[in-house]
C-alpha cells in the first residue's frame, strides 16, 4: 500500500475528511478519506499536495 506523509496531514478528522482520514489545506486525503477536496478523487485518491502524480488521482485504494 502506498503511503505518503504530508507535512500538513491531520491524523484524526479534519475540515473535509471523515474520522479515518485527515486533510491538509489543499484537501489532501488520508487512507480512507473519500473524495474531500480539490486534490481528491471519489475513492480517496489525491493530487500533488498529497504526493500523487496527477491533479486528480495519484494515491488511494482504487487508483
Swiss-Prot record:
Testis. Belongs to the MST(3)CGP family. Keywords: Developmental protein, Differentiation, Repeat, Spermatogenesis. This is Male-specific sperm protein Mst84Da. This protein is mostly composed of repetitive C-G-P motifs. Pfam families: MSSP. The keyword Repeat applies. GO terms for biological process: sperm axoneme assembly; spermatogenesis.
